[in-house]
Amino acid sequence: MKKKGYAVTAYHLKTVPDSLYLTKQIKHKVCCSPSDTFDAKKVAQKFGVELKIIHVENVFRETIIKYFINEYKRGRTPNPCFFCNDWIKFGVLLERIIQDGNDYVASGHYALLRDGKLYKAKNKEKDQSYFLASIKREKLGYLVFPNGEYNKDEIRNIAKDLNIHIHSKEDSQDLCFIPDNNIYGFLKENGVGFKEGLIIDTKGNILGTHKGLSNYTIGQRKIGIAVRERMYVLRKDFEKNLLVVGKKGEVFNNKFTVSKLNFLQDVYKKIEGYVKVRKKFKEVKCRVYVDNDNLYVETREPIFAITPGQIAVIYDEDGAVIVSGVIEKEGWNGFESFN
C-alpha cells in the first residue's frame, strides 16, 4: 500500500488477554498472541508506520466467545471465525479505523473485490471468501485485499525480498481463545454440560455410551464404540440425550435450510449457483429458493455431514459470493417445491 502512495497506519487487534497464553500451552500457531503483537511492532517500525493496538477483549468475550459457548449448549457446531470477521475485524475495528479518518482498510485476507462484489482469491487453496462472506455489503467499499491476486508462496517471497522477519512464519490454525486446542476443557470451564447417555443406531439398537452430546459433531467418526462397520454421527437428540449413529452413506443429504442471511448481491426468489458448507469442502452445484428470511437449498449431489451451526456460502458461476447464512437443519421441513 505504501508503494501505491497511500498514507498507511497499522492496526493490531488484541482479542484475548495476554495472560491466557501464559496459563495455556499453545499447541499450534494462533492469531492475536503476544508474539503476533511483537511481530506487528517490529514490522511497523521497519517501514516507519504508526501502529495502533486496539483492545477488544471485552466485546470479543461478549460476542464471539458467548456465541461459541451458547451454540455448543444448543448442540450445534459454531464457526466463530466467520462471525469474528463481521462483528470484530470488519465491525468494531473497521468503525474505529474510519473514525480515525482513514479512507480504506487493507487486510491480508485472500479474496478479491471487483465492482462491489466479493470474489474467491486467485489462490483457491488459500481463498478466504468463505469466512469473509459475513461482511455486510455496505462495508465492501471500504475494503482492500491486496493478497487476493497472489498465492501464499508469492507473498512469502515478497516478504523475504523485503527482509521482513515473518516471511516464513507458520499459518494460524487454532482458535485464538483456546490456544491449547482443548475445546472440551474450555466448554466444561464455561458451563457446557457433558451428561452421559446412550449411543444408538437408526434402528434403535444400543451400541454404547456417549460422553455428552456437546462432545460430538455431525459426521464424526471417532465415537468410542467397538463395531464391525465404521459408524458416523448422524444426529443428536437432546430431549432424550441420545447420540444417533449410522453408516457413512446415511450422513449424506442434498437438502438443507439456512437462516441469518447476509446478501452480497441482489437476489430474487430463485438462485442457481454453487454452495460451500465447510472451508475445506468443494463447492457443489445447487439451486436455492429464498422465502421468509430462509434459504432452502437443494444440491445436485449429496453433501457429507450437513451440520447445524456451520456456514453455507452460495457463489455464482464467476466465483462471487451471492449470499451466506447459518445452516439450521437438514431438509426443508414444510417447504417442498420450487414450483
UniProtKB/Swiss-Prot annotation:
The record marks H109, Q310 as: Interaction with tRNA. One of its GO terms (molecular function) is tRNA-uridine 2-sulfurtransferase activity. It catalyses: S-sulfanyl-L-cysteinyl-[protein] + uridine(34) in tRNA + AH2 + ATP = 2-thiouridine(34) in tRNA + L-cysteinyl-[protein] + A + AMP + diphosphate + H(+). One of its GO terms (cellular component) is cytoplasm. Gene3D superfamilies: Adenine nucleotide alpha hydrolases-like domains (2.30.30.280), HUPs (3.40.50.620), Translation factors (2.40.30.10). Disulfide bonds join C84-C176. Keywords: ATP-binding, Cytoplasm, Disulfide bond, Nucleotide-binding, RNA-binding, Transferase, tRNA processing, tRNA-binding. Its EC number is 2.8.1.13. It is found in: Cytoplasm. It is an enzyme of class 2 (transferase). GO terms for biological process: tRNA wobble position uridine thiolation. Residues 126-128 are annotated as: Interaction with tRNA. The keyword ATP-binding applies. ATP binds at L13, G108. CDD domains: MnmA_TRMU-like. The active site is at C84, C176. Belongs to the MnmA/TRMU family. This is tRNA-specific 2-thiouridylase MnmA. It comes from Thermosipho melanesiensis (strain DSM 12029 / CIP 104789 / BI429). The gene is mnmA.
